[in-house]
């Protein structure tokens, strides 16, 4: 699926700062051996990935692992499968792999933001968690016709 990605000017208008734009560039190049990812950013990627896998297992019984790639600002599950996900109040939705990826990323980033909130030394990870979550929500707003946004918002609410 292709997203209608915002331009740098549009991201600036949304309040994203240069530090986040630099981090987004690192994420987009993460799989490149020559990206020279800074150590503190590597720690952010490591924890994001750990929380991602834990939440994927918890959110859907259909999820049995798979190949995830970090591109375009978030982790994407490479799968043609459908995933059943439940809201906290009993409703069930069936989503495709892209929608499942977005849901799992939002849960993982939220968990990271809460865990690192006001922890001395983790301000950078907290800031990135919040900004990447906001970035994914911006992509959602720009892809309303392509995704089951009702399911994504209901499950993550």
Where are these regions (language model features)?
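Charge-rich, low-complexity N-terminal segments
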Residues: 1-38
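Intrinsically disordered, low-complexity regions
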Residues: 16, 43, 66-67, 74, ...
């Amino acid at each position: 699926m292709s997203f209608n990605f915002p331009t740098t000017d549009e991201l600036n208008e949304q309040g994203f700062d240069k530090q986040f734009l630099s981090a987004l560039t690192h994420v987009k190049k993460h799989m490149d051996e020559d990206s020279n990812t800074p150590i503190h950013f590597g720690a952010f990627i490591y924890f994001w990935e750990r929380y991602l896998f834990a939440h994927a297992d918890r959110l859907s019984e259909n999820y049995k692992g798979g190949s995830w790639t970090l591109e375009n600002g978030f982790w994407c599950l490479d799968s043609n499968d459908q995933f059943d996900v439940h809201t906290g109040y009993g409703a069930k939705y069936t989503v495709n792999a892209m929608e499942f990826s977005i849901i799992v990323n939002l849960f993982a980033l939220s968990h990271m933001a809460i865990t690192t909130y006001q922890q001395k030394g983790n301000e950078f990870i907290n800031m990135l968690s919040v900004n990447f979550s906001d970035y994914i929500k911006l992509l959602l707003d720009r892809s309303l016709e392509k995704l089951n946004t009702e399911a994504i918002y209901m499950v993550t609410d």
